[in-house]
């Protein structure tokens, strides 16, 4: 598990993985998200029309698969 500093240093790597998972997220969305979990959940809701619980579940699944902690 990585700490916040390590995650920040690897943001570009994880940004790519996020775009693979959620292709509707734009580069502008990624700038807004910039390592902030609540922003990611909100942008997934906005782009995919998901309820918060569905967006949250997707993020948890993604975090688990990628061993990512905010």
From Swiss-Prot:
InterPro entries: CsbD, UPF0337_stress_rsp, YjbJ, YjbJ_sf. It comes from the Bacteria. SUPFAM superfamilies: Hypothetical protein YjbJ (SSF69047). Pfam families: CsbD. Belongs to the UPF0337 (CsbD) family. This is UPF0337 protein YjbJ. The gene is yjbJ.
């Amino acid at each position: 598990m990585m700490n916040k500093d390590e995650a920040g240093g690897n943001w570009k790597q994880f940004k790519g993985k996020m775009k693979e998972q959620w292709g509707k997220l734009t580069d502008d969305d990624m700038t807004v998200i910039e390592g902030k979990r609540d922003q990611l959940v909100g942008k997934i809701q906005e782009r995919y029309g998901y309820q918060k619980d569905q967006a949250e579940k997707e993020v948890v699944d993604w975090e688990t698969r990628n061993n990512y902690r905010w």
